[in-house]
Amino acid sequence: MKKYLVGGAVRDGLLNMPIKEKDWVVVESTPEEMIKLGYKPVGKSFPVFLHPKSHEEHALARTERKNGYGYKGFKLYTSSKITLEEDLKRRDLTINAIAKDKNGNLIDPYGGIKDLYEKKLKHISNSFKEDPLRVLRTARFAAYLFHLNFFIDSKTLKIMSEMIDELFFIPVERIWLETKKALLCRNPHVYFKVLLKCGALKKIFPEIENLFHIKSFYNKNINLGSLTLRALYESSLISNEIKIRFSMLCHNFDKFNSNNKKNSFYCNKINGNLILNKICKRLKLSNEIKKLSKIALDHHDTLYKIFFISAKMVIKFLNDINAWKNPKIIDDLIIISKSYGISIGYKKKSMHKQEKFIKNLYKKLNSIKTKDIIKDGFIGINIKKELMKRRENIIYNDFIIYK
């Protein structure tokens, strides 16, 4: 029995990046021997075991052969006679097919170290095209390693573009898992740029791809898709929360192509929300993500109008986003609005003024408590009326705002 460290741990170690987890390949062994040595079997489709002490995954060397469609259309073979090189060959990219033995020696049969040095994401063989999930994985690695100037090899990108029809066979759960990982990268926008470039975006995220066919109102030479990805990037500089980053992808869903020569698009919140509901339902997203995405769609530009709307509209806005019971929504919306603003050309300094304004406004309005109104003798429907009146008075007396 011999075991080798493989995959991301070797790759990230060579790149001096943090190692998140360690995976091992075991050759010249059998399931019976692994169990006898105390390893716990956990794999359903193929023999994977947990180390009795470290609990790190150890997989018996295996090969695979295409026998169907999609990323599950494979027949797996495992045997004590399968070599390390044969196991590494079934992997997606050369940089993920480097192994390390117990003495620290590197085994690199497919040139992964050279490609790491050249910052290249390159497929190992033509068998790459047999698994459509690799389109998403390669796009994710492009996002993950973008800060190190990695790029996708042109031949690999060409193969990816030839695989897009099989994306249909990937379960939505796997699509969301890869997308979620990509959204948590330092440069999440790169993932969607790669999917756009190889034609996959239209297949799995048609709602986002459609934005690339709508010209911006602010700059006719830029489309809304590009602005959306720019906003996503800006949000990633401020927050690492998945709900905020995904919301940035949805904030332009209410924009549609216009036949009017003066305006490149028109807004329709109702249809925009229908599109949002469709993508959230398809991806089976959490209520938390859905709620913030809806707020981003409906109110991402409200902070830019805050100086020019009436007191009643300000209070309605805060009611709509449920700010009284969920104060954090103000901070989330500020991040969304700032990211949107920067994407369309606002300066950060001017947005700081609006951020300070809305925070101070909310703090004062939220200081009015229903219990104090009841103490003053108001009952029934008059409590709500008095609450509204007092909040309006604060806006009129303490803040410069339209009546």
From Swiss-Prot:
PANTHER family: MULTIFUNCTIONAL CCA PROTEIN. The lineage of its organism: Bacteria, Pseudomonadati, Pseudomonadota, Gammaproteobacteria, Enterobacterales. This is CCA-adding enzyme. The gene is cca. It comes from the Bacteria. GO terms for biological process: RNA repair; tRNA 3'-terminal CCA addition. ATP binds at residues 8, 11, 91, 137, 140. GO terms for molecular function: ATP binding; CCA tRNA nucleotidyltransferase activity; magnesium ion binding; tRNA binding. It catalyses: a tRNA precursor + 2 CTP + ATP = a tRNA with a 3' CCA end + 3 diphosphate; a tRNA with a 3' CCA end + 2 CTP + ATP = a tRNA with a 3' CCACCA end + 3 diphosphate. PROSITE patterns: HD (PS51831). A single active site specifically recognizes both ATP and CTP and is responsible for their addition. Keywords: ATP-binding, Magnesium, Metal-binding, Nucleotide-binding, Nucleotidyltransferase, RNA repair, RNA-binding, Transferase, tRNA processing. Mg(2+) binds at residues 21, 23.
